[in-house]
Amino acid sequence: MSNGTIVQCIGAVVDIQFPRDSMPKVYDALKLEDAADSFAEAGLTFEVQQQLGDGVVRTIALGSSDGLRRGMKVSNTGKPISVPVGHGTLGRIMDVLGRPIDEAGPVETDELRAIHQKAPKFDELSPSVELLETGIKVIDLICPFAKGGKVGLFGGAGVGKTVNMMELINNIAKQHSGLSVFAGVGERTREGNDFYHEMKDSNVLDKVAMVFGQMNEPPGNRLRVALTGLTMAERFRDEGRDILFFVDNIYRYTLAGTEVSALLGRMPSAVGYQPTLAEEMGRLQERITSTKVGSITSIQAVYVPADDLTDPSPATTFLHLDSTVVLSRDIAALGIYPAVDPLDSTSRQLDPLVVGEEHYSVARAVQQTLQKYKELRDIIAILGMDELSPDDKLAVARARKIQRFLSQPFHVAEVFTGSPGKYVSLKDTIAGFKAIVNGEYDHLPEQAFYMVGGIEEVLEKAKKLQ
């Protein structure tokens, strides 16, 4: 293939000149030829983003651009970035280019696939109405997940997105006999390390492929690592499997796009985001889908800047999801974990035709009780509980019990809390909340409902408290 030379470097964006008759195509991967006389990364990969004309292409460096200088030779591979896919990737940790970073030798697979693929056609898609039980009460009741659906965990800094994601991985990936792909996009290296050991200790490492592009990596890596993970998941789906695809964190994918967009010379849009925000998000999300051959169930953590759900990045993500789990700082401040907001979280599956009449009516009754408590809170703050009518007092007492019963000890937090994690089946969850709403446990103290599993544990705890 043709060779070119570097003519300009601005951070992660590098301009490279090729002969006019052999310009690389957009998304072609280019490789740095010889970096022996400098401390630049040997074999550094660039991805073409724009053709500027006159043989010059503007590229993103997928690695550190330290040590690059004008005049260095670059070769065109003639094809997009391709990564190893298939069963050889299971149990391995890879970077954005599919290179192993777990010091366990090369990835044993001959099959490579380009990270830029078209989304499945409309007639290939397969909608699903089968529910996926998570064992987390608040999620199963208020915002149930669909098998083959897309789920977003929305929350600001420090309200528990990653802990919730780890618990979902613990409950679903371990119960689920299929394969999982985990894409760590711009998150902490420590979390990736914890995830690896969590999987190893529970003996499911041989069913998980891991791709990491962490916070300390250049924006090119963080921008493409989600596509690398997705390409591996698509390959398993296309052989007829049901795949779990975890992404932590979608916001960092957007942020990397913002960093790159400014360097590429594009005019910023609202709040400084890239003008192509919706298109970039759509290109990723439209590929995360289930076909008639196999399914991808994806669970994505979404950081919410300054707790503002109307920020363009989380607002653009909302459009693509089947279930949204919103984590609230106010609920976390009450010490209720998982800090899921039952009034803000939604699911397309919460429909009597999908979940059944009983589940639907219990979930709505729980939400109505909590909504009433929310409305009465201002009156209580000003006038106190004594000024409420007997009916309102009863509604508040039940709402406080429901609020506490929505908390649950997690398996992944055992080491911090000292209390063993609980998995609660959907049947037990519905029965428990139905009994509280119907007033069967009005005589029990509200402390008995805090941080327990099923309703039987509430009765045991109440006996101890008395």
From Swiss-Prot:
It is a peripheral membrane protein. It is found in: Cell inner membrane. The keyword Cytoplasm does not apply. InterPro entries: AAA+_ATPase, ATP-synt_VA_C, ATP_synth_F1_bsu, ATPase_a/bsu_AS, ATPase_alpha/beta_chains, ATPase_F1/V1/A1_a/bsu_N, ATPase_F1/V1/A1_a/bsu_N_sf, ATPase_F1/V1/A1_a/bsu_nucl-bd. The keyword ATP-binding applies. It is an enzyme of class 7 (translocase). Its main location: membrane. ATP binds at G155, G156, A157, G158, V159, G160, K161, T162. It catalyses: ATP + H2O + 4 H(+)(in) = ADP + phosphate + 5 H(+)(out). It comes from the Bacteria. Keywords: ATP synthesis, ATP-binding, Cell inner membrane, Cell membrane, CF(1), Hydrogen ion transport, Ion transport, Membrane, Nucleotide-binding, Translocase, Transport. Signal peptide: none annotated. One of its GO terms (molecular function) is ATP binding. GO terms for cellular component: plasma membrane; proton-transporting ATP synthase complex. Its EC number is 7.1.2.2. Belongs to the ATPase alpha/beta chains family. F-type ATPases have 2 components, CF(1) - the catalytic core - and CF(0) - the membrane proton channel. CF(1) has five subunits: alpha(3), beta(3), gamma(1), delta(1), epsilon(1). CF(0) has three main subunits: a(1), b(2) and c(9-12). The alpha and beta chains form an alternating ring which encloses part of the gamma chain. CF(1) is attached to CF(0) by a central stalk formed by the gamma and epsilon chains, while a peripheral stalk is formed by the delta and b chains. HAMAP family: ATP_synth_beta_bact. Produces ATP from ADP in the presence of a proton gradient across the membrane. The catalytic sites are hosted primarily by the beta subunits. This is ATP synthase subunit beta. It comes from Azoarcus sp. (strain BH72). The gene is atpD.
